[in-house]
Amino acid sequence: MDDPLAQARAFFLAGLDAYEAGRLADADRQFTAALALAPGRPSVLTNLGAVRLKLGRHAEALALLREALAQEPDNAEALGHCAAALAERGEPTEALALFDRALALQPARAALWTLRGSVLNELGRGPEAAASFQQALEQGGDAELNAYYLAGLSRLPPPPGAPRHYVESLFDGYAHEFDAHLVQALRYDAPRRLTQRLARAGRRYRQALDLGCGTGLCGPFLRELAGSVTGIDLSRNMLDRAQALGAYATLLQADVTEYLAAAPEGFDLVIAADVFIYVGALEQVFRHVSRVLPPGGTFCFSLEESQDGAELALRSSLRYAHSEGYVRRLALDNGLHLDAIERAPVREEQRQPIPGLFMWLSKA
């Protein structure tokens, strides 16, 4: 095949196939090859920008999408992806303007109504956000996801947990910036706080299980406490970052509750730093952890503390908060003893501390 444009088309079609199959790295290679043979082609720029967006490479995505829009200002697909990239980079006002332009061109795009609602929620415009999520439902959008968003904006009983694909997508896109943003911008310190108390006790654990391990922020601390560390997370991109640390003997892509249901016994330390804010209801987690732990085993975790007395609440930030009484009840029901509790901010949100609970339990 000697015709450069024909070669570019072949790479482009292969990129579309890879993208649809979720093979993002392969899609990136194919679209990059197509762009080299057909520089400036808006369709290639748009799709490569979409891939880079999903890979968490937001600045690169934005540059590609803006180049596409310079040629096709009314490209609704490029507008939508560009808006999403701006939202990921913390520019919600600019993102909203592009979402509105895209939806004026293609009002039936349910996913854009959902993303628009998220941006409005971030801007503190709750009623408009709710209307956008409702419009997404009317256009045939993801029922579970939009109901979850709407629950965070209402006083309705919250769903039992965040949709799995929401969490996976959120952290896949966040992986490249996660550590710096969480630790530096949001003053996140849960891994150190949770493990510091264990280190002071001087106990050596055989096997530690890091639930929702993310990029591995707990890993270096756990490596000093345990002979072997296993990490579980939904996000493949997060696990790839954790793998590079070398702190984990095993890393598995799995839902926390589903993994615990089938997990082998023998973990004498189970830790969950800032994880239950997406798990929601914790009945199954406590039941399975109690089964996995041997007598004397340790279970420690951080929570956002519910401020209105509700055992379980879904906040407008779309994170769950839990009450101390809820945890005490679950501990009692599952043969776990509350050894220590500390109240301290779990992180900051819009430069305001988020009240948190840090809890250390042991199996009786």
Per-region residue spans from a language model:
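Class I SAM-dependent methyltransferase SAM/SAH-binding core
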Residues: 209, 214-259
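Conserved beta-strand signature within the Rossmann-like core of class I S-adenosyl-L-methionine
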Residues: 296-304
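A conserved beta-strand element that flanks and buttresses the S-adenosyl-L-methionine
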Residues: 271
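A short glycine-rich, Lys/Arg-flanked "PGG" loop and its adjoining helix->strand segment in the class I
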Residues: 283-295
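Helix-start (N-cap) detector for alpha-helical repeat units in TPR-like alpha-solenoids
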Residues: 8-9, 42-43, 76-77, 110-111, ...
